[in-house]
Amino acid sequence: MTGTPLTIAVGFDGSPDAEAAVRWAATLAAGTGADLVAVHAVGLLEHAGIDGRATAHRQTVERIADAAGVDPGRVTWSVVDGDPCSAMLRVTGERPEIGLLVVGSRGAGRHHGSVLGSTSLELAERAHVPVTIVPTGRA
């Protein structure tokens, strides 16, 4: 790793686990001077209500980042078509400055009874950058 702060990508779907991931990533970004990119994946069936939901999600991310002390100019938002795993992999592939991917242990789909959701497991296996999976209730 170089002396330049990396960019941290964090997945956000509005779930409590995703909020914990944003808190963890924002705290790290504030402490290191890194940029923070929040990524929200939008599936085909979600497009109808995306405007209101995306605005609410963006405001939540901005509020959490502000509380952690992240400079507002260092926080960006990306809405990406596709399933959450594909969207996160696409963003990290298209943006070489991203050096860390942060996700919650389970997202909005929640597989009850499992410690990790399918997206976090798949990202841990397939991502080309380090992945931090924030456990439920942490951050």
Predicted regions and their residues:
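Short glycine/serine/threonine/alanine-rich loop segments
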Residues: 32-35, 70-73, 129
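Short, well-ordered secondary-structure micro-motifs
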Residues: 21-22, 48-51, 87-90, 113-115
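Structural beta-alpha unit
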Residues: 1-3, 17, 68-101, 108, ...
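Short, surface-exposed alpha-helical segments at coil->helix boundaries
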Residues: 51-62
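Glycine-rich, Arg-bearing micro-motifs that act as flexible, cationic patches
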Residues: 100-126, 139
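Small/aliphatic-rich secondary-structure junction motif
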Residues: 2-51
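General small-molecule cofactor/ligand-binding pocket signal
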Residues: 37-39, 76-80, 132-134
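Active-site phosphate/pyrophosphate- and oxyanion-stabilizing loops and adjacent acidic/basic residues
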Residues: 26, 62, 90, 121
